[in-house]
Amino acid sequence: MVMDAGKKREAGALLPEEAFETGAPEGTLGAEEELWLADPETLKLAGGAQKILAAEPAEHFSGELIDCEVEANTGVHREAAGVARDLLARRRTLLEHAGRLGRVLGTSGTHPLGDWREQEIIDKPHYQYLKRKLGWLIRRNNTFSLHVHYAVQGKEKVIYLFDRIREYVPHFLAVSVNSPFWQGEFTDTRSARALVFSRSLPHAGMPEAFGSWSAYAGYLDFVGRPGVIRRLGEIWWDIRPHPRLSTLEIRAFDAQTDPARSEALISLAAATCDMLCAEYESGELRPARPVREIEDNKWSAQRHGLDGLFVDHETHEPVPARWAVERLAELAASSSRRDLSSLERLLEEPTESERQLLVWRETGSVKEVARDIARRTRAAIPAT
C-alpha cells in the first residue's frame, strides 16, 4: 500500500514521531495481495519473482520471502472498488510476466502442492536476515494472505480500534478460508495458512489488547531497544497498527482466488473499522475481549470455516459462524455507508476452501486442485 511515510523516530523506539497524526485521510483504504508462481506442467511452486520485481515499480510490487511469491500493492482509495481495481490491474501485469517466464499465476492461502524445502529465499537483506535469525521457522512459512489497510488519525483511536477489532478476526478468517491443503495433503482444516503462520513465527497470531498508546509504545520499546526485533515488520500479528503508514492493518484473510471475493472482504474490513470509529467518537467505549475469549472462535474458523460454531461474546451461547459473520455485517452497515451487498452474495456461496475440496473429491488429485486455482486466477482477469 502506498502512503506517505514519516522519517523521524520517537526516541529509543521504532515509532515515527508523526504516526497516526499525518498520512492518508481517515477511512481511506489500501491492500496487499500475495500471489504464487508455479510450473505449468508439474504445478509445483517455481521461482521468478525477483525477475518480475526488477522490471516493475517498487510501489506496485514487492518481494515476500520466497522467489515464487509476489506481493501486489495498491494505491490509496476511498472505496473498496478502487482498491479492487488496482489489485486486478496488478494481477494482469503479473499474468503477463508469468507467461514470459513460463509460469502460471495463482493465489490461495497455501499452495496445495507447495514444498517449503524446495523454495529459495529471495536475495533481499531483510529476508536473508530473517533466514539467519529464524532458520527453519521462516523457511516453512509458505503462505499467502490478503492484507487490508484502513487509515486512522489519532494514536489513542488506533489502539482502541486495534483492541476492539481483535474479536472479529475469527469472522474475517471464517469467511475467507482458502487453504485446506499443506505440502500436498488435506489437513482436515479450512485454513492451514492461519495455523502454519501463527505457529511458525514469534510475534504472530492473536495479540493481547493494549488499552492505550503508551502501553503499545512501551511494548515496542521493550522489544526494540534490546534488538529483539529490528523493525516493525517483524511483528506478524493478525491485526496490527502500521505506524509508518498511519493505518490499522487487518491481516486475518486468506488470499482469495476470486478477486470479487477480495473486494467483498475489503468492504467488510472497512465497514467494521467505520463501526468502531463511530463507537470511539461517540464516547460509548466497550471493553476489549481477552485473547482467551477469541482463540476458540479462531480455532473454529481455521478448522471449519463458515460451517463451524462460534461462542457469542454477549450470550455465551454457540452460534453458527455464518450467522456471526452476517450479524457483524449488519452491525457494521448500521454505522457505515459502504456497500456490503457483495458480501451477502459471498455468504451464499461455498468458501474458496470448499471449492478446492470439491475439485479434490471429483479428481482425487491435489495437482488438479492447483491447476484449477491457476485456471480460475487467469479466468478472472479480463482481456484488455
From Swiss-Prot:
It comes from Rubrobacter xylanophilus (strain DSM 9941 / JCM 11954 / NBRC 16129 / PRD-1). ATP-dependent carboxylate-amine ligase which exhibits weak glutamate--cysteine ligase activity. HAMAP family: Glu_cys_ligase_2. It is an enzyme of class 6 (ligase). One of its GO terms (biological process) is modified amino acid biosynthetic process. It catalyses: L-cysteine + L-glutamate + ATP = gamma-L-glutamyl-L-cysteine + ADP + phosphate + H(+). This is Putative glutamate--cysteine ligase 2-2. InterPro entries: GCL_type2/YbdK_subfam, GCS2, Gln_synth/guanido_kin_cat_dom, YbdK.
